[in-house]
Regions:
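Aromatic- and glycine-rich beta-strand/loop motifs that create alpha-glucan
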Residues: 1-27
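Hydrophobic/aromatic residues in alpha-helical transmembrane segments
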Residues: 73-77, 125, 159, 175, ...
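Helix-loop-helix units of permease transmembrane domains in multi-pass membrane transporters
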Residues: 77-113
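Secretory targeting signals
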Residues: 33-40, 47-72, 110-172, 176-179, ...
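Pore- or pathway-lining transmembrane helices of multi-pass membrane proteins that form conduits
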Residues: 21-25, 170-188, 200-207
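Terminal transmembrane helical anchor/hairpin motif
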Residues: 41-44, 186-299, 304-307, 311
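Transmembrane alpha-helical segments in integral membrane proteins
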Residues: 70-85, 300-322
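Transmembrane helix-loop junction
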Residues: 13, 83, 96, 127-131, ...
């Protein structure tokens, strides 16, 4: 096993590159600007000092992480292998006692380090700003947010490097990576809903079976899996996990919402008066959320992308005649 040699070389090369320092500045700017706003203005304060950090994470930081962090992660990983293939240095690397599997694993681990180190630094600097602000700083909540955000970023890096190993050059790699980014950011939920509509219209799959399929497909989206885990962590009480899954559905009539709550998420669906008429709310019940929709399952689906991407990349990379 020599993948660790490849990983160390990848990271050392990045330390000598200006790219790592640019990444550090980008990460820091993304996170410190909202924290600075909380320090000097009233961003996050209107909900109260006690819940200000939750509001800042839920409405600002989660959007920053899911929209901008994948772009930075893709920038860090899209040319990891394809660039060396084009330049010919990959042949030299493989002439050493490294297998193609070692190269894939080493490149993934090395680029994860390239992204993880500046991201960790950005979280530390950002924490100092938040501590100095008028918000009530909650170390446990912030550390949880930082850790899951790093996991999400590293998953995207692993996918980016894997795509780089599966294609012939960096142009194809950036096209593949940007297609992946656009899909998980803008279109995945639309596709999941369309599949649910198709199951109902053409196969007669309706009710709980239909909504279970749609929710499962949505959770397979790494961006959505990360976001719903964080929404669960930000919620209060034992019903937070259920409400985090429930809020993944918007619209629909009260009957559909009741089915999602009671028959899919094992909750207690109750109608309450609302501004536009009665609406269905999903309250706590004696049953817990089904295991395959739990936070642990969502985390498993998120990490599954690493193995899936690496397997596809290794199979494709192994077929190429360098």
């Amino acid at each position: 096993m020599s993948w660790d040699v490849v990983a160390r070389k990848e990271f050392r090369d990045a330390l000598r590159s200006k790219g790592l320092w640019v990444l550090s500045l980008v990460f820091t700017a993304f996170f410190v600007i909202p924290a600075g706003a909380a320090l000097w203005w009233d961003v996050g304060i209107r909900g109260g000092q006690e819940v200000g950090l939750q509001l800042l994470i839920e409405y600002i930081y989660l959007n920053i992480v899911t929209l901008f962090l994948p772009l930075v992660a893709i920038f860090a990983g899209y040319a990891a292998i394809s660039k060396e293939r084009t330049s010919g240095s990959l042949k030299l690397l493989l002439s050493l006692p490294h297998s193609r599997k070692d190269v894939i694993i080493g490149k993934v681990v090395g680029r994860c380090g390239v992204v993880g180190v500046p991201l960790a630094g950005a979280f530390i600097v950002n924490a100092l700003f938040l501590i100095a602000s008028r918000l009530t700083f909650k170390p446990g909540l912030y550390v949880t947010f930082a850790l899951f955000s790093m996991v999400f970023a590293l998953v995207i890096v692993a996918v980016a490097v894997s795509i780089s190993g599966a294609v012939e050059n960096s142009l194809y790699s950036i096209i593949g990576n940007m297609t992946f980014f656009v899909s998980i950011t803008f279109f995945w939920n639309l596709w999941a809903n369309s599949i649910g509509d198709g199951l109902g219209e053409y196969l007669g799959v309706t009710g709980a079976a239909n909504w279970t399929t749609v929710l499962f497909l949505k959770l397979l989206n790494p961006s959505q899996a990360y976001k719903t885990i964080m929404n669960s962590m930000l919620g209060d009480g034992s019903n937070a996990e259920r409400l985090a899954r429930y809020r993944m559905f918007s619209g629909g009539n009260n009957s559909e919402q009741a089915t999602i709550c009671s028959d899919v998420l094992a909750g207690n669906a109750t109608e309450v008066p609302g501004f536009m008429g009665n609406r269905t709310v999903c309250q706590e019940s004696a049953q817990s959320v089904p295991l395959y929709f739990s936070d642990g399952a969502a985390l498993f689906y998120l990490l599954l992308w690493i193995g899936l991407a690496a397997a596809v990349s290794y199979y494709t990379f192994n077929q190429y005649d360098l």
